[in-house]
Amino acid sequence: MAIKLVYDKYQNDIGFTYGENEGNHQHEILTKINENDINQDREISIFTWGIKKHKAPECDIVFDATLFSTKTNVDVKKLNGLDEVIQISIINHPMFDLIIEKIITEIEINNPKTIGIYCNYGKHRSVGWAELLRNLYYNKSIIYHIGL
């Protein structure tokens, strides 16, 4: 199992406050990695969990989202990564395009059958990233949210 950092929060000095950009960051969907088409028919099992709450499942590649942070003026206590406001805050992060490209590159090069994404409690960041991966790139993936 290889663990990859999603993002180093020490670089996130500017942060993001929901409403500043009116939620209109235009993510350009990637179609190729290293001149090869992205396999959007790829079937992947994606697991999400919270490192402080759950035992990690066995995965081929694991992405650590504990240091990834976004800011929003919405109270997220009653929300989770399935909610659009959480996913929009991830997409509107100033480094989203770079981060998603790194994740897709790892998947396309290493051809994992299972990937994991974890954050602290398994409710917001890991769930949001997994849902975005499925919605934007790997529609046939199956997601298991251990923390929900």
Question: Where in this protein do the model-derived segments appear?
Answer:
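C-terminal accessory "lid"/substrate-recognition subdomains
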Residues: 21, 30-113
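Histidine-centered active-site/metal-ligand motif
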Residues: 25, 124, 145
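Catalytic cysteine-centered active loop of the rhodanese-like fold, especially the PTP/DSP P-loop
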Residues: 103-138
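A short beta-strand micro-motif
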Residues: 4-6
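Acidic, low-complexity, intrinsically disordered interaction modules
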Residues: 10-11, 15-29
